[in-house]
């Protein structure tokens, strides 16, 4: 105080002498007032610290309302303690008014720029103007007092005041009560109350912070206060309430976010007209930082530096119109913080920029030289020459420009400053103009500048991958915006989490782009879609697609093909080699081939137009090859019928000529569908690729043709192949007769059966069918030559056949119709078999009882099959033999199969004898034995059978002697092969049948028995049936007769047994699928005449099948219904429910037969059926099922 007084005295004494005393007194009063104010501020600071300490300790929301009232007024007002102080929200952050004349006085909100200089801050320091009436235009006195008091209390308690208020308090442990329900309810209520109170406390604290920012007296005070909050970690705590649902808290957070971004808004609105000095200082700083070295090729002036940075004009207002000072400030931050990345990107773009300028200068010089040359040429040459020179020079200029454009595409660049300003606007639009809360804004103060650096590096990365020219600037910018927007909505909490999320997005994006490229390459086809239905590789002579109707098939008429057809020598096309060398031709044949090409003007195969090199260049060549192979194989397999072949050669191919009306005149035609249509060039290898046999050659074909035509009287010359036309020529004389054609057919059929395995069976069938067609079309001219190509093109000089889609379509349509008809025929056959099975079931049900009752008195044989009845009575002393091993054949498949038969050894022996008898009947033209199964003519057939026993013919005796000498399985005749194939689908087994002898016949007439091995594969047709009881009786009688005759023929039996043992293995192997009865060798029985009498053809008892086993046994399986006569069509048999019901094998011991032998021998003369004991079953086995 004393120093101040002395200074004032010195001032007074040094002042002007005219200074009056009143002025001195006034100055002294002002000094006194200032002293009083200082005293008052000290007292106010002490009282404010007391209040802040009270708020720090009590943590009540209403106390922040008191602090807000202290901040907005300079005087204290009494507060009623009984009235609660209401919440006072903070004012909305003020906007910035840009006015050039009053920019300093009317700018309202502070600007948050960390890189501004003191000079710029003093010139553009804003003055706060709040919406609240209490806030005046002058600096607030309480802002500094409250700030000092809060800092003092924080130092006193060693913890930040705001962090202490905003943190959630630790909940104190509740007292344990006896009632747990009341305890839980109290805990919930306390938690709810504490949450609500804490939200109010947070809202009050944030409102006080916003009020402090709004009442800052200067920009310096505003920025200082904001940086203190950030440095002390208050923003980290405030960021945790971004997800709060309390409306007051969210409102205050939004206001605090607005305060943080108001500085960014102010910088964006600062133009060169408002603050020219700051703008120029920032530009100079950017140029110095971007080009720190002045040596070498670095620019020296700011104009050159700004041009390299991407500034297009000198008008800074236009350049900075979109971003203002904010764009330059972001670029300075990027250069200062990440100089290495910044310098690398900038140098790369400058290098591309310089190269393009050099190329442009060279182009301008070349154009000048060309123009001078044009002028000289115009003076020296005529007008026509001048025009030609001008055209040539212009074309050279166009080529140079095109080359330069290609180089420009490779050396694409972008404007560095343009990208910086655009990305600044992009981030400003995403975050600043949005009204949502983002945690990244509360993370750090330079969040906006950090996002700018990340986005700039992202743009450069995408540009290096996808940017090829200046036109790609907009797509790359859109992709950058999409990535930033995607990350924005994930709401990352910090810049570090933003970078991690960006890395994940980029990895996903690059992997997807790579996958899409791979899919496009895999799905791409060579030349696009094909115009041909055959799936031929696309492309004509020019490589185009031929989309229009006129150009659709122009690829089949290219110049390359025409030159190939017109040439007389072997021509190696581009990218291919001629493998097949053609033989020399006469001039006549060459002229004829040229006339043919002039008439047709169409190749046989579109494969001629595409070379192997074109297919190899395609990314996926195997798809086209696979498609063509499948279609060609389909068309070749469907053309196997003779009618289709005739239509393809005559009707569908358009061969019309009046000279071919004579069937014996015409040319022999031979066409092979699987051989390539044209040989030479690339098509030599296409035959093996498209399914044709690679080992088949035309030399073999010529040898076959020579052998086929050897039987013709006038032999023609050997066929010759012409590689130019792809045709075979053959001379055939007109004197070929029908005999020669027939011999040729037989010889070629034998050749087709003995062809090499390399030739496909379809090719063999084609050769046989073509021989049938050649017999009807033989030529009358001896010297005429018919060119026969291995394709569908046939041209004899008068007519031509064009290969087109119509003929292919017709042939396929006919083949499909034939296949449909075959399917219908098969369906009819299956349907008829099903109907037969149904009828057999009905017949068995209706005729079962009648046949069982009338079996003893029935004199005629019923051909319908029957199951042995289970209620058949047997003698009391009869004991069936059950020593068979049923476990071997007792599986489920054997029980349920329809192929279970009477001792299959006996049944198959019947088959062989029936085939032999049918053969003998056909040779001697005797038809009386063919109708053995008709019930109306049984007596007549019995008489014929007896006559056949008495009078054997010499031919039959010879056959029997051969069978005795060679008791091996004999081959079937050729006539029975077809029958075997037709009946092979259904396995049939006959029942044992025997003939009824006449009552007046003597015992001496009983025929002898010859036992021979049978053929397992004989046909089973034409076997008669008998009812079950009659078959049992006849089996016993035959068994007795066989045992008597065997005693006199022991030597013959021993020899035959040895042969049977040798053939047992072969018989078992051939009948593995058929169940065979155990321990009974398979024999064939031929009943030979035992005395004199008329000789008959058949030596069977029933004039039918004459084969029975040496030791017959009864059936253990049901009788199948397949064995029916030609006149009757009995249905299929009924399936047995169990194998135990099928046990009908009965063995009669030799002792019992010897006891009854006298009875049987004495009664045969009177009646065969009387003397032979009747075997009857007592009871069938019950099923266990």
From Swiss-Prot:
Give one GO term, molecular function aspect: GTPase activator activity
- Regions of biased composition (Polar residues) lie at 648-665, 721-732, 781-790
- PROSITE patterns in the cross-refs: ELMO
Domain spans labelled ELMO:
275-488
Stretches the record annotates as Disordered: 88-133, 176-196, 361-409, 566-628, 642-805, 819-868, 883-989, 1044-1114
Bias category Low complexity: which stretches?
94-127, 176-194, 361-406, 587-613, 688-699, 733-760, 767-780, 853-864, 912-974, 1053-1072, 1096-1109
Residue ranges, compositional bias (Basic residues): 829-841
Coiled-coil segments on the chain, per record: none
Protein name according to UniProt: ELMO domain-containing protein F
């Amino acid at each position: 105080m004393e120093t101040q007084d002395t200074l004032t005295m010195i001032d007074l004494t040094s002042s002007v002498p005219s200074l009056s005393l009143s002025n001195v007194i006034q100055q002294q009063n002002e000094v006194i007032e200032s002293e009083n104010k200082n005293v008052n501020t000290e007292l106010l600071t002490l009282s404010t610290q007391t209040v802040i300490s009270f708020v720090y300790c009590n943590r009540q929301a209403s106390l922040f309302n008191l602090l807000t009232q202290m901040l907005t007024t300079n005087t204290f007002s009494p507060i009623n303690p009984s009235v609660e102080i209401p919440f006072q929200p903070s004012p909305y952050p003020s906007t910035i008014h840009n006015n050039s004349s009053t920019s300093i006085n009317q700018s309202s909100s502070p600007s948050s720029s960390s890189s501004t200089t003191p000079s710029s801050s003093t010139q553009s320091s804003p003055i706060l103007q709040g919406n609240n009436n209490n806030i005046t235009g002058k600096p607030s006195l309480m802002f500094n007092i409250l700030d000092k008091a809060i800092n003092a209390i924080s130092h006193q308690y060693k913890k930040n005041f705001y962090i202490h208020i905003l943190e959630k308090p630790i909940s104190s442990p509740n007292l344990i009560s006896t009632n747990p329900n009341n305890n839980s309810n109290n805990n919930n209520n306390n938690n709810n109350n504490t949450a609500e109170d804490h939200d109010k406390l947070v809202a009050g604290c944030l409102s006080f912070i916003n009020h402090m920012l709004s009442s800052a007296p200067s920009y310096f005070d505003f920025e200082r206060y904001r940086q203190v909050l950030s440095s002390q970690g208050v923003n980290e705590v405030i960021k945790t309430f971004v997800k709060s649902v309390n409306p007051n808290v969210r409102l205050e957070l939004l206001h605090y976010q607005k305060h943080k971004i108001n500085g960014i808004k102010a910088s964006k609105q600062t133009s060169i007209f408002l603050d020219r000095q700051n703008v120029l200082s920032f530009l100079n700083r950017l140029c110095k930082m971007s080009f720190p070295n002045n040596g070498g090729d670095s620019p020296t002036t700011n104009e050159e530096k700004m041009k390299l940075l991407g500034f297009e004009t000198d008008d800074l207002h236009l350049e900075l119109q979109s971003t203002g000072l904010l764009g330059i400030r972001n670029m300075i931050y990027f250069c200062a913080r990440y100089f290495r990345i910044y310098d690398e990107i900038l140098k790369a773009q400058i290098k591309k920029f310089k190269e393009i300028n050099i190329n442009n200068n060279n182009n301008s010089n070349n154009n000048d030289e060309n123009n001078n040359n044009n002028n000289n040429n115009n003076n020296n040459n005529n007008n026509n020459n001048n025009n030609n020179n001008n055209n040539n020079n212009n074309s050279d200029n166009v080529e140079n420009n095109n080359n330069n454009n290609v180089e420009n595409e490779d050396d694409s660049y972008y404007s560095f400053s343009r990208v910086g300003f655009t990305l600044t606007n992009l981030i400003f639009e995403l975050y600043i103009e949005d009204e949502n809360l983002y945690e990244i804004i509360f993370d750090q103060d330079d969040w906006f500048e950090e996002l700018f650096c990340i986005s700039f590096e992202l743009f450069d990365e995408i540009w290096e991958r996808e940017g090829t020219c200046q036109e790609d600037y907009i797509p790359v910018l859109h992709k950058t915006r999409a990535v930033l927007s995607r990350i924005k909505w994930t709401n990352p909490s910090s810049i570090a989490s933003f970078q991690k999320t960006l890395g994940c997005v980029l990895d996903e994006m690059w992997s997807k782009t790579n996958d899409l490229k791979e899919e496009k390459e895999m799905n791409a086809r060579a030349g696009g879609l094909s115009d041909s239905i055959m799936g031929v590789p696309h492309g004509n002579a020019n490589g185009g697609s031929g989309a229009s109707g006129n150009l659709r098939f122009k690829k089949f008429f290219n110049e390359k093909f025409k030159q190939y057809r017109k040439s007389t020598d072997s021509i190696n096309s581009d990218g291919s080699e001629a493998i097949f060398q053609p033989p020399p031709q006469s001039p006549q044949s060459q002229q004829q081939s040229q006339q043919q090409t002039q008439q047709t003007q169409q190749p046989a195969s579109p494969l001629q137009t595409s070379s192997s090199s074109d297919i190899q260049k395609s990314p996926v060549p195997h798809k086209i090859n696979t498609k063509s192979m499948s279609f060609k194989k389909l068309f070749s397999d469907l053309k196997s019928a003779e009618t289709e072949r005739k239509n393809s050669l005559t009707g569908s191919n358009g061969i019309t000529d009046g000279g071919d009306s004579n069937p014996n005149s015409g040319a022999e035609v031979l066409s092979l569908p699987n051989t390539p249509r044209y040989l030479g060039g690339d098509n030599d290898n296409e035959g093996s690729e498209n399914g044709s046999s690679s080992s088949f050659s035309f030399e073999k074909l010529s040898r076959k043709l020579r052998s086929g035509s050897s039987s013709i009287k006038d032999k023609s010359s050997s066929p010759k192949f012409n590689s130019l036309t792809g045709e075979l020529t053959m001379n055939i004389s007109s004197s070929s007769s029908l005999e020669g054609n027939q011999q040729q057919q037989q010889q070629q059929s034998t050749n087709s059966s003995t062809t090499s395995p390399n030739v496909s069976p379809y090719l063999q069938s084609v050769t046989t069918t073509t021989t049938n067609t050649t017999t009807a079309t033989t030529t009358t001219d001896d010297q005429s030559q018919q060119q026969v190509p291995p394709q569908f093109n046939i041209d004899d000089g008068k007519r031509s056949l064009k290969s087109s889609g119509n003929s292919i379509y017709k042939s396929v349509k006919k083949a499909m119709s034939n296949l449909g008809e075959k399917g219908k025929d098969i369906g009819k056959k299956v349907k008829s078999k099903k109907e037969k099975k149904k009828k057999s079931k009905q017949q068995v049900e209706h005729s079962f009882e009648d046949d069982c009752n009338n079996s003893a008195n029935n004199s005629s044989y019923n051909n319908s099959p029957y199951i042995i009845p289970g209620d058949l009575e047997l003698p009391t002393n009869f004991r069936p033999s059950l020593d068979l091993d049923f476990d071997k054949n007792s599986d489920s498949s054997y029980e349920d199969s329809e192929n279970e038969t009477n001792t299959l050894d006996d049944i198959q022996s019947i088959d062989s004898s029936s085939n032999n008898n049918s053969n003998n009947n056909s040779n001697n033209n005797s038809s009386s034995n063919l109708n053995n199964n008709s019930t109306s003519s049984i007596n007549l057939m019995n008489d014929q059978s007896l006559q056949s026993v008495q009078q054997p013919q010499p031919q039959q005796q010879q056959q029997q002697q051969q069978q005795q000498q060679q008791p091996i399985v004999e081959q079937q005749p050729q006539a029975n092969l077809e029958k075997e194939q037709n009946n092979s689908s259904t396995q049939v087994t006959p029942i044992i049948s025997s003939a009824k002898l006449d009552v007046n016949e003597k015992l001496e007439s009983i025929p002898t028995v010859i036992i021979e091995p049978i053929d397992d594969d004989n046909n089973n047709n034409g076997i008669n049936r008998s009812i079950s009881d009659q078959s049992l009786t006849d089996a016993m009688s035959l068994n007795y007769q066989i045992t008597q005759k065997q005693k006199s023929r022991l030597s013959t039996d021993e020899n035959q047994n040895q042969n049977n043992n040798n053939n047992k293995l072969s018989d078992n192997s051939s009948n593995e699928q058929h169940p065979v009865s155990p321990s009974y060798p398979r024999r064939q029985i031929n009943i030979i005449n035992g005395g004199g009498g008329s000789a008959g053809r058949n030596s069977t008892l029933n004039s039918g099948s004459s084969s029975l086993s040496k030791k017959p046994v009864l059936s253990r399986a049901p009788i199948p219904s397949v064995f029916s006569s030609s006149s009757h069509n009995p249905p299929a048999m009924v399936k047995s429910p169990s194998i135990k019901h099928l046990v009908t094998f009965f063995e009669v011991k030799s002792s019992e037969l010897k006891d009854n032998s006298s009875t049987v021998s004495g009664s045969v003369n009177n009646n065969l059926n009387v003397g032979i004991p009747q075997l009857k079953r007592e009871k069938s086995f019950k099923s266990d099922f």
